[in-house]
Amino acid sequence: MRSLSCIVCRQKKIKCDRKNPCTNCEQAGEKCMFKEYDSRKIRHPHSYVKALETRLAGLEAFWKRVKYAPVNEKLELLKTISFNDHLSPDISVSKTDTTFEFPVSLDIRGPNTIAFYGPTNVYGPPLTPSSPETPSFPPQNPSFSPLITDCLKLFFKWQYPQFLFINREAFLVDYYYRYHEGRYCSEHLLYAMCAIGSRMSVDPNIAALAKNFYQIAWNKIIEYGLGKSHITSIQCLLCLGYFNIGMGNTSLGWMLSGMAFRMGQDLGFQLNPRNWSVNDHPVVSPADAAVRSRIYWGSYVTDIFISFVLGRPTTLKKSDTSIPDSESLPDFDGVNEYRVNNALLLKEYLCIQSSVY
């Protein structure tokens, strides 16, 4: 006796005695056929099911792009379809840790801002362009006063290891030479860094300016730093979040850091920008991709640190990440003044340790 009903009985939805041939087929004069194997016992691995879901999401996103694309672009989009076997069970089982890159839609709002939308977004391209009356990023006119420069040096010498979401080389090159056209140095970020750096000054008059710097940074980011997501706004929010946590305002610090992470996800900073292109031209240069990598992984460490200090769950998940590890940018003349003073940090650490024990 077989373990499965015959195909005819299953189609007619009648009880089969599972003989070969079965009684129902004999009486009806039909050919009795059985499946060779029981597919109910087949269990696909989770990675295989995940690959199917990812493939389906990609196809849905692709056809949405085709739907909203101009007529002259639809054919070009169809030519990009690949019919390779993406769902080999052997490959899926052997690569259980593979990160699946979801298809993205990019809203390029200007040279400094790119918004990311995943496969389930309801905004079909083209999106509404930004209003010209609303600046997508703050005006760039950082101050070169000795006070500002000294506070920045204090920030990088004493606090930088905790603020690795700021790429020192990219920031300083933009601060001094406007090399990146303000992408990595803005007023609100500058004053947020000064608020933290000034507190490390041995001069009580400079240390007392920390709250003033904080208020300036806060006013500026409220004025023009939240309307559109921007890299320096992410960094500023994290600096302000750290500042508040250090002052005991843990709820506000937690909220500001959460805003920063959400803004980063709006920019897709957890994804590998080297895969983004428009008309076969990369959207993000290799140098900018390296900076974005540092910003994301620095934010990732910050998320873990703040969550650990406050005993709360993290926001950024490694499983959602495809951006590669960060790399160091080349030095430039004058960067030594902004290096972390390891000897002084060790000396202070030993002093603190001796006072505690």
Curated annotation (Swiss-Prot):
SMART domains: Fungal_trans, GAL4. It holds the Pfam family Zn_clus. GO terms for cellular component: nucleus. It is found in: Nucleus. PROSITE patterns: ZN2_CY6_FUNGAL_1, ZN2_CY6_FUNGAL_2. Disulfide bonds: none annotated. GO terms for molecular function: DNA-binding transcription factor activity, RNA polymerase II-specific; RNA polymerase II cis-regulatory region sequence-specific DNA binding; zinc ion binding. Residues 6-32 bind DNA. This is Uncharacterized transcriptional regulatory protein C11D3.11c. It comes from Schizosaccharomyces pombe (strain 972 / ATCC 24843) (Fission yeast).
